[in-house]
C-alpha cells in the first residue's frame, strides 16, 4: 500500500470517524502512510448530502495531517468548477479533482468523450487550482490518458497560504478573527440558564 484514500465523502462524520481510525492505527502500529481525502458535492447548491459547504467540510477535517483534499464524483467538470476553485483558495495542502465523465444519460452511460473531458479540465490546469487529477464514474484508461496528456506540461498549483485563525464549522463555516464580536456557542445547552434543559438532563431525556 502506497497511500490511503477515503473518498467520495457524502457525510463528513463518516470521514472523520475513518480518519480517527487511521490515526489510531498509525499510532498503535508505529507506521505512517500518506492520506488523501475527498468529498462529493451532491447538487448545484454546492453542499454535501448532509448540507455542508466546501469551506465547512474543509474546516471539519483540517486538523488531520493530509497529503491532499479534493472533490470526487460529483456533477461533472463544468459544474464542479466553482467548488474546485474555492477549495484551492482555502486549503493549505495539495488539492485534487476526480470528476465523472459528465452526467449519466438515461441509460446510465456517459456521453462525454475523453477529449471533451480533458479539454474542460484545461481550465482547472491553467488556473492552477489542482495538484492531482483523475477520474471517477464513466472514466476509463482512455480518459486518464487524455487527462495525463493535457496536464503533462502544465504547472502545478502553488499551495495556498492561509492566515492562522480559529476555523469552526457546522453546515456553515465560522471563522473567529481578532475583530470578531463576542461569540456564544451552545447557550441553549446551559443547565443553569434553562430550566427546561436542566430537567431533561436530570431525567435522562436526551432525545427530547
Where is each model-derived feature located?
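Domain-level signal for soluble alpha/beta catalytic cores
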Residues: 1-208
Amino acid at each position: 500500500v502506497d497511500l490511503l484514500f477515503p473518498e467520495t465523502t457524502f457525510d463528513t462524520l463518516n470521514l472523520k470517524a475513518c480518519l480517527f481510525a487511521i490515526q489510531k492505527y498509525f499510532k498503535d502500529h508505529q507506521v505512517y502512510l500518506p492520506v488523501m481525502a475527498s468529498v462529493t458535492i451532491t447538487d448545484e447548491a454546492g453542499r454535501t448530502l448532509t448540507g455542508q459547504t466546501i469551506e465547512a467540510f474543509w474546516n471539519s477535517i483540517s486538523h488531520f495531517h493530509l497529503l491532499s483534499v479534493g472533490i470526487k464524483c460529483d456533477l461533472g467538470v463544468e459544474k464542479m468548477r466553482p467548488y474546485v476553485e474555492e477549495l484551492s483558495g482555502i486549503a493549505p495542502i495539495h488539492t485534487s479533482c476526480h470528476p465523472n465523465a459528465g452526467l449519466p444519460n438515461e441509460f446510465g452511460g456517459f456521453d462525454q468523450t475523453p477529449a471533451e473531458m480533458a479539454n474542460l479540465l484545461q481550465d482547472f490546469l491553467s488556473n492552477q487550482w489542482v495538484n492531482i487529477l483523475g477520474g471517477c464514474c464513466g472514466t476509463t484508461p482512455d480518459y486518464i490518458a487524455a487527462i495525463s496528456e493535457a496536464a503533462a506540461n502544465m504547472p502545478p498549483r502553488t499551495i495556498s497560504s492561509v492566515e492562522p485563525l480559529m476555523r469552526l464549522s457546522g453546515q456553515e463555516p465560522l471563522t473567529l478573527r481578532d475583530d470578531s464580536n463576542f461569540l456564544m456557542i451552545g447557550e441553549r445547552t446551559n443547565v443553569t440558564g434553562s430550566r427546561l434543559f436542566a430537567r431533561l438532563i436530570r431525567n435522562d431525556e436526551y432525545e427530547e
